[in-house]
Amino acid sequence: MTQTAAQQPSPRLVSGHGLATTAADGAVLDVWFPAPVAGPLSAADASLRDTLRALAADDADRGTTQAVVELEVDLDAAPASTADAWLRLHALSHRLARPNELNLDGVFGLLTNVVWTNHGPCAVADFELTRARLRARGAVQVYGVDKFPRMTDYVVPSGVRIGDADRVRLGAHLAEGTTVMHEGFVNFNAGTLGNSMVEGRISAGVVVGDGSDVGGGASIMGTLSGGGTQRIVVGEHVLLGANSGVGISVGDDCVVEAGLYVTAGTRVSVLQDGEAAHTVKAVDLSGVPNLLFRRNSTTGGVEALPRAGRTVELNAALHAN
């Protein structure tokens, strides 16, 4: 009797036609994918390839060349090239994949550190000579020196407002109805899943649920440095008060008082009927809904109070983008 092998799941594919900019030393500075799709390359718009070929141009002042690339990647496999990494970042910002739902292992090693200018991406090596050549065209503005560009230079998602484009990296996932104010920040592989007000920092790996407000100066711990591995989720209808911070996931309909930073090891007194019932580490309350986290103004201790039946409501007029 023969046994039928277990059917392997179909790969999750993203594909697209892109325009790659390459420096004189062969380093890929950027790859723009204007219309990536979820699925195989055959599903992508073939006419876009000809449009991009017409746009491809060499730039002697920057020492760059451009060429069309065609790429199909398995989101569950690790990125295999610089163009592959760029396609994944575009997939996030085009909402083809949500944060933490695609493999980004090794992405930093694949991306090139680039001088981002108003004349396009430039190599870091000998940039002052490049700047001198570009000055013949007019003023040279350097937006940054980094591996990740501004999202809006490559993707402008529908239904969002962004007060300062410098504050949102390519690879950010902004859902319809998201407003990022001038002091808000959204890293790559992070973002919102619904209507949200962002006036604080959403670090890499963090997702914020529908109807939530990240208050001015608020901070949500990420996973890029310090050895952290916990993925933090901010639930739906959550308010993180101004200058607050969290190092744990926050459940639906929770409020963190302004100025209070709750790390995983913070000792929290859980109150019932106004009395302390027991004390736990904050990580034990990770993801628990309907809580108010506050600092007792007399003792300075951190407390968690139940707030069942109450929710956070955003101003709908501010999110009709």
Swiss-Prot record:
Offer one Pfam family short name for this entry: Hexapep_2
What pathway does the UniProt record associate with this protein? Answer: Amino-acid biosynthesis; L-lysine biosynthesis via DAP pathway; LL-2,6-diaminopimelate from (S)-tetrahydrodipicolinate (succinylase route): step 1/3
* UniProt-annotated binding residues for Mg(2+) 1: 166
Cellular compartments annotated:
Cytoplasm
A GO MF annotation of the entry reads: magnesium ion binding
Q: Recorded E.C. number(s)?
A: 2.3.1.117
Q: Known catalysed reaction(s)?
A: (S)-2,3,4,5-tetrahydrodipicolinate + succinyl-CoA + H2O = (S)-2-succinylamino-6-oxoheptanedioate + CoA
Q: What residues does Mg(2+) 2 bind to?
A: 183
Superkingdom of origin: Bacteria
Q: Which GO terms describe its biological process?
A: diaminopimelate biosynthetic process; lysine biosynthetic process via diaminopimelate
Q: Gene3D superfamilies under this entry?
A: 3.30.70.2010, Hexapeptide repeat proteins, Trimeric LpxA-like enzymes
Q: What does this protein do?
A: Catalyzes the conversion of the cyclic tetrahydrodipicolinate (THDP) into the acyclic N-succinyl-L-2-amino-6-oxopimelate using succinyl-CoA.
Would you identify the family this protein belongs to, as annotated? Belongs to the type 2 tetrahydrodipicolinate N-succinyltransferase family.
The protein in question is named: 2,3,4,5-tetrahydropyridine-2,6-dicarboxylate N-succinyltransferase
Organismal lineage: Bacteria, Bacillati, Actinomycetota, Actinomycetes, Micrococcales
